[in-house]
C-alpha cells in the first residue's frame, strides 16, 4: 500500500458564524487566523459543529473556500463533505478538492441507514471521484449506523481512505482499528471528553469542539502527549475537562457558540432548529471557561 497522509494533533471543528441570518464572513475569517495563531494543528469547516445541515450548498461551498483562502496553507484544511446522498457527497468532495482542501471529512450516511455494503459502496464512490484523502466520520449517536471495523478495513485498501474521526466514544474500538489497519491509519477522536484514553489506546489526535474556544490548550495537550510528557497532558486534560463536559449539556453547537460569544469572537446566533442555550447551561459553560483560565 502506498504511503498515506498523516493527520496528527488538535483539529478544530469550526463553528460557522452568522449575522442577521446570513454568513458572517469577516467573523469566520478572523476565527481562522486566530485558530492558527493559537497553535491549532488543523481546521475542519462545515461539519456538525459548523451547522452544515442548515447551510445551503452554496453557503457550504463558500465557507470551505473562505477557510482555505484564509489558512493559506499554514495548517491542513479538512473540509466537511458529508451527505446521505452519495451524489451530493461526491459534489461537495469534488468542490473541496478543486478549492484546495487537503482532505475531506465524510460522515456515514444518516437517516436512510445503509447496510455495511451500502456504506462501503458510498465511500468507494467518493474515493473513486476525487484525488485527496478521505477521513471517515463514524458517529453512531447522530447517524444511527455504526461502520464496522471489517468495513473500515475494506475501505482502507482504497487509495484515498486515510483514517477515521471516531465518535463512538469506545476505547476498545481504537485498539481494534489499530490492530486491523495498522499504525498508519489515522485515528482522530470525535469525543473531546475521552481524548486522554483515546490517545492511550493509540489515537493520533482529535477533531475537537472544545478547541473552538481553547485552541492553545488543546494543542498543548497534544504536543505534551506526543512528546511523552503524560503528566503535563493529564494536567491539561483536567483543566479542559469541565469544558469537554459542559459544552455538550445541550446539543452542539449551541453551547460552544455561547462560549465563543463570551470571548467576543462571534454573535451567538444559530439557525433553527438549533436554539440558544438555557440559563443553567450558560452558568455551567461560564464556570468551565473560568476553570480553564479563559475568562475571569
UniProtKB/Swiss-Prot annotation:
Asked whether the UniProt record includes Hydrolase among its keywords, one would answer no
Could you say which EC number(s) this protein's record lists? Answer: 4.3.3.7
How does this polypeptide assemble, per the annotation? Homotetramer; dimer of dimers.
Residues binding pyruvate are 49, 207
State what this protein does: Catalyzes the condensation of (S)-aspartate-beta-semialdehyde [(S)-ASA] and pyruvate to 4-hydroxy-tetrahydrodipicolinate (HTPA).
Q: Give the location in the cell.
A: Cytoplasm
Which residues are the active-site ones?
A: 137 (proton donor/acceptor), 165 (schiff-base intermediate with substrate)
Q: Where is this site: Part of a proton relay during catalysis?
A: 48, 111
Q: Quick check: keyword Lyase in the entry?
A: yes
Reaction it catalyzes: L-aspartate 4-semialdehyde + pyruvate = (2S,4S)-4-hydroxy-2,3,4,5-tetrahydrodipicolinate + H2O + H(+)
Query: What processes in GO biological process is this protein linked to?
Result: diaminopimelate biosynthetic process; lysine biosynthetic process via diaminopimelate
Q: What does the entry list under GO cellular component?
A: cytosol
Matches recorded under InterPro entries: Aldolase_TIM, DapA, DapA-like, Schiff_base-form_aldolases_AS, Schiff_base-form_aldolases_CS
Keywords per UniProt: Amino-acid biosynthesis, Cytoplasm, Diaminopimelate biosynthesis, Lyase, Lysine biosynthesis, Schiff base
What protein family does this chain belong to?
A: Belongs to the DapA family.
Q: Write one Gene Ontology MF term.
A: 4-hydroxy-tetrahydrodipicolinate synthase activity
Leading EC class: lyase
UniProt-listed HAMAP family: DapA (MF_00418)
Name the chain's protein.
Answer: 4-hydroxy-tetrahydrodipicolinate synthase
Name its pathway. Answer: Amino-acid biosynthesis; L-lysine biosynthesis via DAP pathway; (S)-tetrahydrodipicolinate from L-aspartate: step 3/4
Principal subcellular localisation of the protein: cytoplasm
Amino acid at each position: 500500500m502506498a504511503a498515506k497522509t498523516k493527520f496528527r494533533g488538535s483539529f478544530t471543528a469550526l463553528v460557522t458564524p452568522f449575522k442577521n441570518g446570513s454568513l458572517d464572513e469577516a467573523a469566520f475569517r478572523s476565527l481562522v487566523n486566530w485558530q492558527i495563531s493559537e497553535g491549532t494543528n488543523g481546521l475542519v469547516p462545515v461539519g456538525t459543529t459548523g451547522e452544515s445541515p442548515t447551510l445551503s450548498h452554496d453557503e457550504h461551498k463558500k465557507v470551505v473556500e473562505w477557510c482555505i483562502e484564509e489558512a493559506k496553507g499554514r495548517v491542513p484544511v479538512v473540509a466537511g463533505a458529508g451527505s446521505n446522498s452519495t451524489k451530493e457527497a461526491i459534489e461537495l468532495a469534488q468542490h473541496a478538492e478543486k478549492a484546495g482542501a487537503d482532505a475531506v471529512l465524510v460522515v456515514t450516511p444518516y437517516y436512510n441507514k445503509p447496510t455495511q455494503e451500502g456504506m462501503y459502496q458510498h465511500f468507494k464512490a467518493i474515493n473513486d471521484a476525487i484525488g485527496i484523502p478521505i477521513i471517515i466520520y463514524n458517529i453512531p449517536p447522530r447517524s444511527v449506523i455504526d461502520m464496522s471495523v471489517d468495513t473500515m478495513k475494506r475501505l482502507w485498501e482504497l487509495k484515498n481512505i486515510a483514517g477515521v474521526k471516531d465518535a463512538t466514544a469506545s476505547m476498545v474500538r481504537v485498539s481494534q482499528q489499530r490492530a486491523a489497519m495498522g499504525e498508519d491509519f489515522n485515528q482522530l477522536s470525535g469525543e473531546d471528553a475521552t481524548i486522554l484514553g483515546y490517545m492511550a489506546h493509540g489515537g493520533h489526535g482529535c477533531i475537537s469542539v472544545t478547541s473552538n474556544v481553547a485552541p492553545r490548550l488543546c494543542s498543548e495537550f497534544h504536543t505534551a502527549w506526543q512528546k511523552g510528557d503524560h503528566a503535563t497532558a493529564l494536567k491539561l486534560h483536567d483543566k479542559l475537562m469541565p469544558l469537554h463536559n459542559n459544552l455538550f449539556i445541550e446539543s452542539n453547537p449551541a453551547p460552544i457558540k455561547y462560549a465563543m460569544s463570551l470571548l467576543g469572537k462571534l454573535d451567538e446566533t444559530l439557525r433553527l432548529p438549533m436554539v440558544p442555550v438555557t440559563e443553567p447551561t450558560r452558568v455551567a459553560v461560564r464556570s468551565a471557561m473560568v476553570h480553564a483560565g479563559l475568562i475571569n
